[in-house]
Amino acid sequence: MAASSSLDHLSNRMKLEWHSKLNTEMVPSKNFRRTSIIGTIGPKTNSVEKINSLRTAGLNVVRMNFSHGSYQYHQSVIDNAREAAKTQVGRPLAIALDTKGPEIRTGNTPDDKDIPIKQGHELNITTDEQYATASDDKNMYLDYKNITKVISPGKLIYVDDGILSFEVLEVVDDKTIRVRCLNNGNISSRKGVNLPGTDVDLPALSEKDIADLKFGVRNKVDMVFASFIRRGSDIRHIREVLGEEGKEIQIIAKIENQQGVNNFDEILEETDGVMVARGDLGIEIPAPKVFIAQKMMIAKCNIKGKPVICATQMLESMTYNPRPTRAEVSDVANAVLDGADCVMLSGETAKGNYPNEAVKMMSETCLLAEVAIPHFNVFDELRNLAPRPTDTVESIAMAAVSASLELNAGAIVVLTTSGKTARYLSKYRPVCPIVMVTRNPAASRYSHLYRGVWPFLFPEKKPDFNVKVWQEDVDRRLKWGINHALKLGIINKGDNIVCVQGWRGGMGHTNTVRVVPAEENLGLAE
């Protein structure tokens, strides 16, 4: 079987038949990865040169973790990322701000010393301020004032990612809970606390989060990864804080607790996208159930046509080792097969010894995992699940993807203002790349969230429109997009290109699909 020529034709088979035809000699027919890669920038990668090296390896989105670092440090990341983006004109690099989120922590022990505690030991957990700096094995302070109102006997309390666990015996009064320690460990200062199975009423944003979001608005970040989202109203609150100036910033809801899973449908209605944040989620719910939650959330995002990111510990061993474990590679591949639009690296690129190698490994794994996707079947299922009647833009996107599959097209080239049409095209998961051409700088960056989309920023200003000038401008942008795709090797000369455009300028008018050949001197307007 020819390695590259057979792939596109085989992908219309049923899933089991398609998988049975795979072999290790198969390679993608084009050097095109559909899944975007998000990388956290830390001290080891915070320079223009190192960010460019990560981009060469396959990075699409720069992430800043606001649980760590000063504003001065994060400003340097933004400045370095924007300087790095200038080296590839027209190829945008997105910037994401990951909030710390509201959290519960223990108090301080005397002199911040660890205090040993034995399994079976009973003590009080208290919100009394007198113990805020005097936590010990008799009274351990928590900074969540309402804990006595929401917790009940039999519930669990995890400290320091579950290293120390307690069972609630009794709610004594409005400040005190009697608990039993479930394992040997140490009571330490300022450790994070999880309350699995308990509906907490923490605010969506802390004061620090609000200040951080305003910093992001001032610096025109492209997306916010909002931590510990529990309900749809949390997203509305974040949107209010971002305000008019931050209206183009995409809000990605991080689902990290049982409440977020339980309220996922209402969150999905409000948010621009979702992150399956498996670290804290694996503490809040039993670890064997995390993969069920992951599959559910990714599937619902795919059906809704909203981007979804899979994150946490994906190639964690590469923080210190040059090669990942086989389980980690399978984890990345399975996230791609589940339908993730993006995968994310944290410590691997922020503090790891092998950041470039980690991005390259993730890129190669995604590229090969995409070979195993039966795209025709995925398209048919998504089309059948689409609500009826669909709006015009989604109908055109559906028709364009169908045409691209039937024609074995080299690419879909879409002209868009807001990126909405590109998002709908991405929803239906074409085999070929989606070459997005836009004049909107923000859309060109945040569209990295959409699987299969290669966004390009068109450099020419919008002309004063009449019908003739508008059509010439449309053809000029299409030709520009095709030529850039040819130069980058995304498509080949002679490929069929499905072009998607509007019938007039502005947002919301996409209604035209046409097919042209990929040629450098394409007979469109100059």
UniProtKB/Swiss-Prot annotation:
Substrate binds at R63, G279, D280, T312. Keywords: ATP-binding, Glycolysis, Kinase, Magnesium, Metal-binding, Nucleotide-binding, Potassium, Pyruvate, Transferase. It is an enzyme of class 2 (transferase). The record marks K254 as: Transition state stabilizer. It comes from the Eukaryota. K(+) binds at N65, S67, D98, T99. Its cofactor is Mg(2+); K(+). GO terms for molecular function: ATP binding; kinase activity; magnesium ion binding; potassium ion binding; pyruvate kinase activity. ATP binds at N65, F66, S67, H68, R105, K191. Pfam families: PK, PK_C. It catalyses: pyruvate + ATP = phosphoenolpyruvate + ADP + H(+). This is Pyruvate kinase. The lineage of its organism: Eukaryota, Fungi, Dikarya, Ascomycota, Pezizomycotina.
